[in-house]
Swiss-Prot record:
Subunit structure: Part of the 30S ribosomal subunit. Forms a tight heterodimer with protein bS6.
Organism: Enterococcus faecalis (strain ATCC 700802 / V583)
Protein name: Small ribosomal subunit protein bS18
Keyword RNA-binding recorded: yes
The entry's keywords: Ribonucleoprotein, Ribosomal protein, RNA-binding, rRNA-binding
One Gene Ontology biological process: translation
Function of the molecule: Binds as a heterodimer with protein bS6 to the central domain of the 16S rRNA, where it helps stabilize the platform of the 30S subunit.
Amino acid sequence: MAQQRRGGRKRRKVDYIAANHIEYIDYKDTELLKRFISERGKILPRRVTGTGAKNQRKLTIAIKRARIMGLLPFVSDEQ
């Protein structure tokens, strides 16, 4: 017998940056940037975080700058 699919619409995630009216994403604000990085140190995609395209681009630039300055790790050794 074929299984029936139970589908429901997933609630859209809210853009944290737009919701909190953050105009400038500073690379020195590591607490904000850590919200958008996985435990392995990878940048989380938009579909996971719910950020808009423009804010995701700004986040990516800020995270990469923070990594180069040594404020954030490139990879995490936690297992």
